[in-house]
Each structure stands twice: as structure tokens, then as C-alpha cells.
Amino acid sequence: ALKKAKAIYSMFGSFYMSYNSGPTIEPEWNVKCDIDAARKFTSSGANIIYAGLDITAIVKLDKTKRDKLFMRHSPVTDMLEGLYVLWGNETPTLFDPVAIGMVLYPDLFKTKKVHVSIDAIGNTIIDTTKPANAEVGVYINTNEFINRLMKTYMQQNLER
């Protein structure tokens, strides 16, 4: 069924760096929660583009932008403020918006075709000896991405 999609963009994996942007990969949450499902996903034959920690863990919302969002008081920004309080993270990392950003703003990203598999503990392994089965995000124009995201959040005006 996954092969029917033209492309699947997924916040998934740690290919070249970890949560703290260190050079050692580690099991990423979406993978380690269900390693068997992750293995089926990566081997499905679908056209998968991964937004892994390599491009998501570096996208953070600084205090100035956070305060601007929270002063907006729209349904979306109020929800974001609630999540911020719930997670208790001073500078939230925007993991999932990056995967959506890959679809909306492809000009801000660079990807690399690689072969991805999952090891026994949930590491996402790139094997350069095998043919590519996916694309992995390797670059994001972080500043422009955050600017576009902020503009979207600030302009939305859903009814309450």
C-alpha cells in the first residue's frame, strides 16, 4: 500500500548525528518505539524521504520568536504555547515541522540517496555498498525555514 504514494516524507531516524547534534548516531524515538514496524517501513519499496535528526535536531525556536508567537493568541499559537508548557523545554526543537517543510519548501533542503536499514536496537544504518532505497535530508536552510514557518503561524486566522 505504501508504494501507491508518490512520496512519503517522514520524521524518522538518526543517520549522521544524534539528538544533541553529536557525530554518533542513536536510536531515534519514532524508530525505537517499534523496531519491527520501522524495518517494514524502510524495506517497503516506497519512495521515502527522511527528515532525520540530522536536519531536525538543529531547528530550534529562540525566545524572541517564541514570545512573538505566544503574543499572537490564535488557535494555533495558543496550542503551540500549550505544547511548549507541556514539554517544558526552554528552546523547543521543531522536529515534525521540518518533515512538513520538506514538502512545502523543497528549495530549502538537500537530500542524499542512500540505502537505509534498521539494526537490532533501532539505529538507522546507511549502507553504501547497497543500492539506494531512500533519500535522507542532509541540509536545511534553517534561518529561512524558521522565517517561513513563523510567517505561516503568524498569518493563520482560524476561527475559535
Where are these predicted regions, by residue range?
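Hydrophobic, well-ordered secondary-structure segments
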Residues: A5-I8, D34, A38
